[in-house]
């Protein structure tokens, strides 16, 4: 049986929700990853260091006994965030990033930033302190096609932001287009990007294969095949600017399979295994460790994890659902289908 050994990876973009949901989703991540950057888009959002520390404690309480897992926290940037709150976040030692959501761009983003000019003072403080800005890179104007939101965001928001704050460390989250990959490659050393497993494995045809596929609907939405190939090329290139961020986003079956379903693919149950598939398909398994375990910590100024994990080429069937919210289950990516790699 073929096996590969990796330094234990980290997930630099993860949603775990709150309350009863934590008991299902946190163990999936803790089994595979040493650390994960937790997204702050709860309702209400995590906007202060104090709230982040309380949320961190709730996450840690859901980690199974004997598992070593460290949640790294982020704050939700709003028009009203103060530079002083950035100071408190930095001093907490637990908050490592601030997340920019353009208002209305994704799940629970209605409190997001309405105009980037409103947070310039905060960005200046972050630049001074070395705090990372994580960016959901889509505009939300009604006249912009949903498949073009990322490219327009680069032109209208991200490129001017990087030019104005050249020392600000920026992660372009869950990139989905060739234009985004090219922007990151061409930018200075303070700009990096996360790439999800589902954007490496799927193109937008997957949303419509034989009917509407709500469990393949995410934001940013899956793009055409040329973009998927560009993402694979970037992720497997060995360029340290690209690293693992699952954007695993749990929603209950009822919230997904409905007239107006939520955006998000749940991948935490098989995250590193799905990345292994993508890298194997690209003939680049030898570059998986750098992407999954080394590049992210290096950008965030952290040491790699000391532990290792082993993956075996041993196919397994993904359950059709996981218990989630009382009688409303969670449907994972590849439900009822097989994943080629297994964590031993």
From Swiss-Prot:
PROSITE patterns: DIHYDROOROTASE_1 (PS00482), DIHYDROOROTASE_2 (PS00483). The modification N6-carboxylysine is found at residue 99. Keywords: Hydrolase, Metal-binding, Pyrimidine biosynthesis, Zinc. The active site is at residue 247. Binds 2 Zn(2+) ions per subunit. One of its GO terms (biological process) is 'de novo' pyrimidine nucleobase biosynthetic process. Pfam families: Amidohydro_1. Pathway: Pyrimidine metabolism; UMP biosynthesis via de novo pathway; (S)-dihydroorotate from bicarbonate: step 3/3. Its EC number is 3.5.2.3. The keyword DNA repair does not apply. One of its GO terms (molecular function) is zinc ion binding. Zn(2+) 2 binds at residues 99, 136, 174. It catalyses: (S)-dihydroorotate + H2O = N-carbamoyl-L-aspartate + H(+). Its cofactor is Zn(2+). Substrate binds at residues 15-17, 41, 136, 219, 251, 263. Zn(2+) 1 binds at residues 13, 15, 99, 247. One of its GO terms (cellular component) is cytosol. PANTHER family: DIHYDROOROTASE (PTHR43137:SF1). Belongs to the metallo-dependent hydrolases superfamily. DHOase family. Class II DHOase subfamily. Catalyzes the reversible cyclization of carbamoyl aspartate to dihydroorotate. Homodimer. NCBIfam families: pyrC_dimer (TIGR00856). This is Dihydroorotase. It comes from Aromatoleum aromaticum (strain DSM 19018 / LMG 30748 / EbN1) (Azoarcus sp. (strain EbN1)).
């Amino acid at each position: 049986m073929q096996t590969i050994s990796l330094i234990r990876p980290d997930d630099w973009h993860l949603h775990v929700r709150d309350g009863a949901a934590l008991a299902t989703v946190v163990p999936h991540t803790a089994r595979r990853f040493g650390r994960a950057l937790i997204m702050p888009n709860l309702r209400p959002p995590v906007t202060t260091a104090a709230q982040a520390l309380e949320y961190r404690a709730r996450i840690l309480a859901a980690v199974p006994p004997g598992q070593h897992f460290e949640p790294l926290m982020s704050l939700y940037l709003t028009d009203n965030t103060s530079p002083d709150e950035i100071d408190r976040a930095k001093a907490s030692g637990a908050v490592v990033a601030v997340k920019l959501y353009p208002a209305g761009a994704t799940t629970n983003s209605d409190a997001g930033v309405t105009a980037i000019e409103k947070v310039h003072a905060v960005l200046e403080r972050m630049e001074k302190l070395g705090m990372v800005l994580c960016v959901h890179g889509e505009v939300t104007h009604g006249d912009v096609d949903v498949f073009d939101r990322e490219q327009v965001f680069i032109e209208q928001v991200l490129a001017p932001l990087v030019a104005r704050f050249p020392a600000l460390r920026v992660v372009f989250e869950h990139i989905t287009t060739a234009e985004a990959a090219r922007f990151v490659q061409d930018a200075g050393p303070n700009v990096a990007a996360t790439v999800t497993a589902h954007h490496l494995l799927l193109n937008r045809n997957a949303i419509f294969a034989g009917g509407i596929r709500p469990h393949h609907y995410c934001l940013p939405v899956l793009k055409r095949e040329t973009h998927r190939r560009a993402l694979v090329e970037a992720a497997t290139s060995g360029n340290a600017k690209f690293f693992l961020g699952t954007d695993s986003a749990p929603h209950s079956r009822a919230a997904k399979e409905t007239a107006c379903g939520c955006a998000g693919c749940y991948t935490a149950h098989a995250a590193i295994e799905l990345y292994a598939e993508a890298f194997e398909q690209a003939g680049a398994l030898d570059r998986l460790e750098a992407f999954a375990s080394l590049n992210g910590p290096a950008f965030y100024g952290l040491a790699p994890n000391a532990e290792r994990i082993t993956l075996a080429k041993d196919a397994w069937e993904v359950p059709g659902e996981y218990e989630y919210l009382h009688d409303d289950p969670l449907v994972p990516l590849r439900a009822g289908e097989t994943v080629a790699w297994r964590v031993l």
